[in-house]
C-alpha cells in the first residue's frame, strides 16, 4: 500500500491546478462540482477501509482521479 500512497499523494498546489483544470474543462462549474462530490461520496461508501487509514480524503482522491481522466481518456469509466 505504500506505493499506492506515494502514487496518489500530491501537494496542495498540484491539487489546486487539477481542480482548475477540471473546472476549465467543464461547461458547467456547478455540474463538475457535483460530479466530484458524488464520486467522493461513492468512494467513501465503497471503500470504508481507506477512510480508516486516513492517508487521503475521498474528495482529494476524486479530484485526482477525475483530472487523470481528463489527461488520459482511455481510463474514463462509466459515470
From Swiss-Prot:
What is the name of this protein? DNA-directed RNA polymerase subunit omega
- Described function: Promotes RNA polymerase assembly. Latches the N- and C-terminal regions of the beta' subunit thereby facilitating its interaction with the beta and alpha subunits.
A GO biological process held by the record: DNA-templated transcription
Task: List keywords of the entry alphabetically.
Answer: DNA-directed RNA polymerase, Nucleotidyltransferase, Transcription, Transferase
* SS bond partners: none
Gene name tied to this protein: rpoZ
Q: Name one GO cellular component term.
A: DNA-directed RNA polymerase complex
What's an example of a GO molecular-function annotation for this chain? DNA binding
How is the quaternary structure described? In cyanobacteria the RNAP catalytic core is composed of 2 alpha, 1 beta, 1 beta', 1 gamma and 1 omega subunit. When a sigma factor is associated with the core the holoenzyme is formed, which can initiate transcription.
Q: Which HAMAP family match?
A: RNApol_bact_RpoZ
Among the Pfam families in the record, one is RNA_pol_Rpb6
- Supply the EC number(s): 2.7.7.6
Q: Which InterPro entries match?
A: DNA-dir_RNA_pol_omega, Pol_omega/Rpo6/RPB6, RPB6/omega-like_sf
Reactions it catalyzes: RNA(n) + a ribonucleoside 5'-triphosphate = RNA(n+1) + diphosphate
Hey, which family's this protein in? Belongs to the RNA polymerase subunit omega family.
